[in-house]
């Protein structure tokens, strides 16, 4: 019998969440963000589910893009961090990849490049996040230099990233959009600013292309505490199995460091998932988990390959019963909130030893 640490990936949920993005921005084209191995869901798995539904894919670098091309995907692919070195330009031309250009050296490299075919580029504007991109006062000159490069296609796009859109009450997003619009004023070409939070919460950010990311995987992009949340379907169920049921006495400690002790005589389940599977070691006692279809909580510290759960008040649980760490009744956002992190990190930190198993239906 295998250890059974696995993550089922619901292809129907991925497509349903993309339809939610489409409904929020019906006039725009969709650049589905599938970087970081499809947010941990599997790059080719996610691309396969969304082929024919998104107009383009966005990944981090040429390695991810070339993997998609090798797997047969012909959609437009945008490299969100652009070229990391001059030789990435030839790779982009060979694989028909689109480049986000955010630095002067990239502009100069394109000006001097002799490529087998021209490339499409997106000029990144630093509208206020201060991570990558050209300051607003440099955008016009950078655009002019790109138009003079013989290896750059004429339809240069403009792109920015929103730093605070996850808080629908933060005025920083409006300021960023004003900065972006002013920086690109009078220049032709498509615009893109909306991440998942922009798609769902900031219609003014939609422009020509939207870039849904975390929402495709069923997690809310918002952190502002408003009651209204998007109706998104979790695409991943992270699952293990109960490998032991222990009947402990009042006062018995559980796990490393004896940080948690049984308040009464009680059953405790041991589940075959640990921090070696990407589950956060710092998850506190009380973090929600589903066991045998019933909601309960963690007790004690997380081990490398195991964790313990409270079985009090549940219908009988037996060895071999399923445990779902997130997905189903327990959302990844709940686990992330208990751990002081975000769902993005939970998805992306999952290692290869956790099997990804695509399913195409309503049941995870």
Swiss-Prot record:
Its EC number is 5.1.1.1. It catalyses: L-alanine = D-alanine. SUPFAM superfamilies: Alanine racemase C-terminal domain-like, PLP-binding barrel. PROSITE patterns: ALANINE_RACEMASE. Substrate binds at residues 131, 304. InterPro entries: Ala_racemase (IPR000821), Ala_racemase/Decarboxylase_C (IPR009006), Ala_racemase_C (IPR011079), Ala_racemase_N (IPR001608), Ala_racemase_pyridoxalP-BS (IPR020622), PLP-binding_barrel (IPR029066). One of its GO terms (biological process) is D-alanine biosynthetic process. The modification N6-(pyridoxal phosphate)lysine is found at residue 35. Keywords: Isomerase, Pyridoxal phosphate. Its cofactor is pyridoxal 5'-phosphate. The active site is at 35 (proton acceptor), 256 (proton acceptor). Pathway: Amino-acid biosynthesis; D-alanine biosynthesis; D-alanine from L-alanine: step 1/1. One of its GO terms (cellular component) is cytosol. One of its GO terms (molecular function) is alanine racemase activity. It comes from the Bacteria. Pfam families: Ala_racemase_C, Ala_racemase_N. SMART domains: Ala_racemase_C. Transmembrane segments: none annotated. NCBIfam families: alr. Belongs to the alanine racemase family. Catalyzes the interconversion of L-alanine and D-alanine. May also act on other amino acids. PANTHER family: ALANINE RACEMASE (PTHR30511), ALANINE RACEMASE, CATABOLIC-RELATED (PTHR30511:SF0). This is Alanine racemase. The gene is alr.
